[in-house]
Swiss-Prot record:
Similarity comment: family membership: Belongs to the non-disulfide-bridged peptide (NDBP) superfamily. Medium-length antimicrobial peptide (group 3) family. Ponericin-W subfamily.
Protein's organism: Neoponera inversa (Ant)
Annotated protein name in UniProt: U1-poneritoxin-Ni1b
One Pfam entry name: Antimicrobial_4
UniProt-listed InterPro entries: Antimicrobial_4
Lineage: Eukaryota, Metazoa, Ecdysozoa, Arthropoda, Hexapoda
The UniProt record lists the keyword rRNA-binding: no
Keyword Secreted: yes
Task performed by this protein: Has a broad spectrum of activity against both Gram-positive and Gram-negative bacteria and S.cerevisiae. Has insecticidal and hemolytic activities. May act by disrupting the integrity of the bacterial cell membrane.
Tissue: Expressed by the venom gland.
Location(s) in or outside the cell: Secreted; Target cell membrane
GO annotations of cellular component type: extracellular region; membrane; other organism cell membrane
């Protein structure tokens, strides 16, 4: 199982969600 790919995908998803949340707050 490729844990590195999974972690990379999760990181991208989390950063995307955090970015959208920051935009909504502004």
């Amino acid at each position: 199982f490729l844990w590195g790919a999974l972690i990379k995908g999760a990181g991208k998803l989390i950063s995307r969600v955090v970015g959208s949340l920051k935009k909504k707050k502004q």
